[in-house]
Amino acid sequence: MSLNKCLLFALLAIVASASVSAERVRYDNYRMYKVNSENAKQLEVLKDLEGSSDSIMFLDGVHLVGADIQIIVAPHKVPDFLEILGKSEIKYELQSRDVQKSLDEIDEKVAIKGRATTAYNWAQYYELDDTYAWLQSLAQTNPGVVTLIEGGKTYQGRSILGVKITKGGETINGKAKPGIFLEAGIHAREWIAPAAATFIINQLLTSEVENIKELAENYTWYVLPHANPDGYVYTHTTNRLWRKTRTPYGSCFGADPNRNWGFHWNEVGASSSACSDTYAGPSAFSEIETLSLSKFIEGLKGKVQLYLSLHAYSQYLLYPYGHTSDLPDNVADFEKVFDASIAAVNKRYGTTYTGGNIYDAIYPAAGASVDWAYGTQDVRMAFCYELRPSSTSYLTGFKLPAEQIVPASEELLDSIVAMATEVKSLGYFD
């Protein structure tokens, strides 16, 4: 039996054993509030509240005075929550009286399990094992072009599976092709990110559009659709809004895998509370997922010139740094690539992206993968996409309707084509 087959069967066995029946988390009569701090004292109150109870869920990090924060509150916690806000004179706005009802309004269309190897498409979302089976089928049907790769492991023993694509070989005129690394799904609830990653894989292998063919043939691609498999499985079996890994920390679970990378870890924009959605972990690379994936990427040092991380939502394009407002030394080039990329994303459907450096464009966030890649791996171009929908979508932002998978992915690929063209023109692929 081939290594690829052995790996796949082991993966599916692990997934099957881990997917035991669990009571699905529901949010009936949970309320969602938008709050906004007006001063540092109010911000500290919110920081203390974040991670204080699993009955109060912050959908946004508590980082900046004046920034809107979405908070989901269990029915029995509402009186205490409002009392705390009232005592500190923190302004709030009720956005949903029944979070579950709001979530149910979006039909995400999840594919029937076990059908993916013959009917994988982008009209629906897929569970982890079906996507892994599809990746395996690509390696089998595209020998010499697609290689199954294991980017790392998870706490629950799953593999972080992806593909290496070398269309036309790994060299051009005797020289190694530049490398593009793409990871998605590091935050479990952001389903559109893995879906877009698989769409890109398919387009690289099948598209007859000239600029996409050039993108496939001129670069070596490393694509990992699920950088947080345990968390993604948990969003399907138990809690659709789960974000973190599934490592146990006392009575709470998981660390934020995009605050856990070993570059200015936990300096700003992360929490030290294990119950928080932005928990940085007890130490840098405490999570098996980030540690093992970082080791894989370190093995590619010198081979990757462009690093991409797919997230959702808000329609942002972001570049380093997240730990400081100081700008990269090649910020002028980042701005040129940024301008070309957001112009391209707008052309097909008129979708508007904004962004810039992470710290100033959205919020401080140390320990992110793009910062680590740029800061430690000599990857001079590193970007994070926050995909559809827009930042005003609030609660339903993580539940992009399945009919938007294709347009969201098409405009993303348009942007990546323009990005690669600009990065090449600036000499980073030389």
From Swiss-Prot:
Zn(2+) binds at residues 187, 190, 311. Its cofactor is Zn(2+). It comes from the Eukaryota. It is found in: Secreted. The keyword Protein biosynthesis does not apply. Belongs to the peptidase M14 family. This is Zinc carboxypeptidase A 1. It comes from Drosophila melanogaster (Fruit fly).
